[in-house]
C-alpha cells in the first residue's frame, strides 16, 4: 500500500486531549481534523484506517468526545478528533462551548492541513453537516467528505444516496468525496490517498 511507504499507519497512539490552544501540541507536524455528527462513525473511521481495534473509543452514547483528541501517527502526522455535533442531550451551553473550541482550532491552527467531514450516506446531511461544510469552504480549509455506513445500503443505491448528499451540501467538485464502510473496509485506500495529498 502506498501510504505504508510514507508512514507506518499502525504506529499510532493517542497523544493528548485539549480544551483550548494552550494545550495543543507545540510542533509543526501536519494535522488532519475529523468532524461529524455524533454517532456518524468517526471513531470507527479512525480505528479502521489505522488498522486498530480500539485506538479511538467507539461509544453507543453519542456526544462522548468532549475535547479535541490528538492522535500521533508514526511521529509524522496527527489526526484530531473534534467533538461530535448535533447531539440533543447535551446542554445548550455545553454545545456552545464545544462550538467555540472547534472554531478556535479550525480557524487558528497553522498545523491543520485538511478536514475529513464525515456524513452518513444513508441520510440527507443534517443542518449541522451543511453548516460545517459551508464553514470550511468559507475559511478555505481543504475538505474531504467521507460518507460512512455504506454497508447499510445496497451497492446499487450508493450513487443515488451520494447525489442526495452532494446536492444538499452544494458540493464543490474540486473537493474529494469518498464512500466508506468500516464494516466492509471500503474506502480505506481512497481516504489515505486524499489525506496524504493534503500533507
From Swiss-Prot:
Highest taxon above the source species: Bacteria
Q: List the disulfide bonds.
A: none
Q: What family is this? A: Belongs to the TRAFAC class TrmE-Era-EngA-EngB-Septin-like GTPase superfamily. EngB GTPase family.
What keywords are annotated for this sequence in UniProt? Cell cycle, Cell division, GTP-binding, Magnesium, Metal-binding, Nucleotide-binding, Septation
Protein name as it appears in the record: Probable GTP-binding protein EngB
InterPro entries named among the record's database cross-references:
G_ENGB_dom, GTP-bd, GTP-bd_ribosome_bio_YsxC, P-loop_NTPase, Small_GTP-bd
EngB-type G domain location: 28-199
Is Transcription regulation one of the keywords? no
> Which NCBIfam families does the record match to this protein?
GTPase_YsxC, small_GTP
GO MF, one term, reads:
GTP binding
The cofactor named in the record is: Mg(2+)
Q: Cellular component GO terms, alphabetically?
A: cytosol
Task: Please give the organism.
Answer: Streptococcus pyogenes serotype M5 (strain Manfredo)
Amino acid at each position: 500500500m502506498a501510504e505504508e511507504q510514507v508512514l507506518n499507519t499502525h504506529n499510532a497512539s493517542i497523544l493528548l486531549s485539549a480544551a483550548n490552544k494552550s494545550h495543543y501540541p507545540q510542533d509543526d507536524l501536519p494535522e488532519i481534523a475529523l468532524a461529524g455528527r455524533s454517532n456518524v462513525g468517526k471513531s470507527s473511521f479512525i480505528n479502521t484506517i489505522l488498522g486498530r481495534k480500539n485506538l479511538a473509543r467507539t461509544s453507543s452514547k453519542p456526544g462522548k468526545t468532549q475535547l479535541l483528541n490528538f492522535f500521533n501517527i508514526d511521529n509524522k502526522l496527527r489526526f484530531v478528533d473534534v467533538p461530535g455535533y448535533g447531539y440533543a442531550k447535551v446542554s445548550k451551553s455545553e454545545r456552545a462551548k464545544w462550538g467555540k473550541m472547534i472554531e478556535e482550532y479550525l480557524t487558528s491552527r497553522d498545523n491543520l492541513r485538511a478536514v475529513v467531514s464525515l456524513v452518513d450516506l444513508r441520510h440527507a446531511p443534517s443542518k449541522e453537516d451543511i453548516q460545517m461544510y459551508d464553514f470550511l469552504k468559507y475559511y478555505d480549509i481543504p475538505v474531504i467528505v467521507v460518507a460512512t455506513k455504506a454497508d447499510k445500503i445496497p451497492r446499487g443505491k450508493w450513487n443515488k444516496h451520494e447525489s442526495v448528499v452532494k446536492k444538499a451540501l452544494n458540493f464543490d467538485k474540486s473537493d474529494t468525496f469518498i464512500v466508506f464502510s468500516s464494516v466492509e473496509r471500503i474506502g480505506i485506500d481512497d481516504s489515505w490517498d486524499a489525506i496524504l495529498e493534503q500533507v
